[in-house]
Amino acid sequence: MASPPRCSPTAHDRECKLPPPSAPASEYCPGKLSWGTMARALGRFKLSIPHTHLLATLDPLALDREPPPHLLPEKHQVPEKLIWGDQDPLSKIPFKILSGHEHAVSTCHFCVDDTKLLSGSYDCTVKLWDPVDGSVVRDFEHRPKAPVVECSITGDSSRVIAASYDKTVRAWDLETGKLLWKVRYDTFIVSCKFSPDGKYVVSGFDVDHGICIMDAENITTVSVIKDHHTRSITSCCFDPDSQRVASVSLDRCIKIWDVTSQATLLTITKAHSNAISNCCFTFSGHFLCTSSWDKNLKIWNVHTGEFRNCGACVTLMQGHEGSVSSCHFARDSSFLISGGFDRTVAIWDVAEGYRKLSLKGHNDWVMDVAISNNKKWILSASKDRTMRLWNIEEIDEIPLVIKYKKAVGLKLKQCERCDRPFSIFKSDTSSEMFTQCVFCRIDTRGLPADTSSSSSSSERENSPPPRGSKDD
């Protein structure tokens, strides 16, 4: 085991008293974006204008070189399809663009009961945002001296941590913005997460291929597991009970570590056919989702003992055209979102494993995604230096979604085991599919791990690095 990391903690003040925004986040004026704002979003001009954008159904990043229709003479009106660019006219999702970082935005979160946003960037900053007007509320002081690869926040939104390529993990008080402590390691840190109860911090190592679990209260080391994987860690996270740590790696392996017994509970080898980029638990802790450079996502049962040797999974395919960088479950696990290097955010129907909608607009890799607790908003962070806040509360009323449901013949059922509502294809003849949701089907079937994903023993060398890789 490595010796405990050096640190310099200061006073702790965990109570957060940030007031909620007074204006509704859903206010917007479609079609009222100024040409100056659009020009800034396009990056073609350097204008001294605010870095905020009104929530609108128009996508300034998808515009052609011509100004919007209301600024053109009548004979030069731009067709509607040019205004929408990559967006399908039947999937008009209201959104807001948040600009303020000077480099790729690597990580994003909702916090303070969805009234604030948190971001970290390769510009070495960690910022707190007001989602109503898109302004930066705070730049956290004593910032890292190298790119920020990931940040995390406690469940009560009192403390923030960030991992950086300067080999440090730093913690701040969210309300005051003051640095609480800094821990320096001997290797690069590529991932960091608070436990849901705020007691622990887990960090993932690059060169050492391991993880470190630290007591966040006393700033002492609980466990250091070197060579936990055979290649660099890409992501790690706690389960909702703060008792298990999941980690994924370039070695295509998934591992579950028990904090109390300090032992590996579960190992799934060759879980994907390429490097695994990210992982996240459902809020029950029963299932784990992994995203990969193989363009797929998988949902694994990591709770019941009978799956300890081989795992059990459902594969989500054909959602991205390139490597998948990130994934995040809704609080009730009714849907899942993922971000990809194809510049899109995919919204998945978990019950039936199909892509419900694809959100387009970013002009570079989507590096991280998040879902608000009320399930009305999606936040995406991109290498294009922006974040996007998407309003999805009326997603089931979108013409494109309705059109797809009619085409495939979806209908709503209730799971006989857990009473969870789920959708099914009318054409499916399997009786089990008509009675149980996807999670209960994994439990009852005891599906073996998907062997098709482990057929390849080599990884694509030209694949882009996952979120948290220092090669970018």
Curated annotation (Swiss-Prot):
PANTHER family found in the cross-reference section: PTHR45048, WD REPEAT-CONTAINING PROTEIN 88 (PTHR45048:SF1)
Gene: WDR88
Pfam families xref list: WD40
Keyword terms of this UniProt record: Repeat, WD repeat
Region (Disordered): 1-22, 447-472
Cited SMART domains: PQQ (SM00564), WD40 (SM00320)
Annotated InterPro entries: G-protein_beta_WD-40_rep, PQQ_b-propeller_rpt, Quinoprotein_ADH-like_sf, WD40/YVTN_repeat-like_dom_sf, WD40_repeat_CS, WD40_rpt
WD repeat positions: 100-139, 143-182, 184-224, 228-267, 271-310, 319-358, 361-400
Tree of life domain: Eukaryota
Amino acid composition bias (Basic and acidic residues), ranges on this chain: 458-472
Protein name: WD repeat-containing protein 88
